[in-house]
């Protein structure tokens, strides 16, 4: 998992947002402030700056990984016992290889693929043309699946209930396959803004030598949240989902990432990866902070997400 440290802060260097966050609820927000913020996204142009910040993030995260590896070596039996029966179906997989421009569909043999309800669409792989780092960043433009609210999928692979609220309330065992997201007061849907963000992020990542798996490469993709996550699990080294927060506020409350709540940290595959999820999110937020973006509170909000519950690579909603 060392490779994921190199991309921890690449994303944060590339998109400086005025407001982004948890799975957006269908609550309208003030348009002028947020829409203008989307148009004024500032992009760094110096490769040296990107390299410097990525290196700083890598050092911090490598320390976290080293601590995890040391703990695992010291207490293998205890961790195995704590995982329980849920761990028996968990699988580590090698990243699948795809050519530039190749469509990436959901392989029904992939772990958790059978939990998906909408999966006829495809992601698209883009390869950097120079200074390639052999790292694939999964970029997920939130929402943008027509019919996504008409079907539901299991919140957790093991069928257990959600432990926190969100778009779907705590205690539910199923959630809408893909929520519709919020709308700005001028009528612009969240999915349009997240797509533009994803396109900008893709271009900057490619220019910096990172390959990009565009989970949604157009206005609509027939891939639900489970399918998007499973595809990233198998074709990317990390998974970054972009969102705007439907909070109804008329001011910019700042950026934050969705951290993993304690209630699901013992469930696989979360148990094996939640520290990496949170490390990725924290690094993105600290990078945004360093480049002048407003941060909401401590920069995180713990929410039980479908994406996190199914992720086997470092994964975060921002």
What are these regions (language model features)?
Residues 1-8:
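Positively charged n-region of N-terminal signal peptides that target proteins for export
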């Amino acid at each position: 998992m060392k490779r994921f440290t190199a991309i921890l802060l690449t994303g944060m260097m590339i998109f400086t947002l005025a407001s982004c966050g948890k799975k957006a609820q269908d609550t309208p927000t003030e348009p002028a402030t947020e829409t203008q913020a989307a148009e004024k996204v500032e992009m760094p142009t110096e490769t040296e700056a990107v390299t410097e910040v990525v290196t700083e993030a890598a050092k911090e995260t490598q320390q976290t990984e080293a601590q995890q590896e040391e703990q695992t070596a010291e207490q293998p039996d205890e961790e195995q016992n704590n995982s329980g029966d849920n761990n028996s179906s968990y699988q580590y997989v090698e990243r699948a290889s795809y050519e530039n421009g190749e469509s990436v569909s959901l392989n029904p043999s992939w772990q958790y693929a059978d939990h998906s309800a909408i999966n006829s669409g495809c992601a698209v792989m883009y390869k950097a043309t120079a200074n390639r780092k052999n790292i694939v960043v999964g970029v997920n433009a939130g929402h943008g699946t027509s019919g996504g609210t008409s079907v539901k999928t299991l919140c957790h692979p093991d069928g257990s209930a959600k432990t926190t609220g969100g778009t779907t309330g705590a205690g539910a065992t199923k959630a809408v396959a893909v929520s519709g997201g919020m709308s700005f007061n001028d009528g612009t849907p969240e999915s349009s803004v997240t797509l533009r963000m994803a396109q900008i992020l893709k271009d900057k990542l490619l220019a910096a030598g990172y390959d990009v798996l565009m989970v949604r490469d157009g206005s609509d993709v027939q891939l639900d949240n489970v399918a998007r996550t499973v595809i990233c699990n198998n074709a990317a080294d990390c998974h970054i989902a972009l969102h705007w927060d439907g909070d109804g506020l008329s001011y910019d409350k700042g950026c934050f990432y969705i951290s993993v709540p304690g209630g699901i940290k013992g469930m696989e595959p979360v148990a094996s990866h939640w520290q990496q999820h949170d490390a990725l999110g924290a690094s993105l937020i600290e990078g945004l902070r360093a480049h002048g973006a407003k941060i909401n509170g401590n920069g995180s909000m713990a929410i039980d997400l479908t994406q996190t519950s199914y992720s086997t690579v470092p994964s975060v909603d921002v």
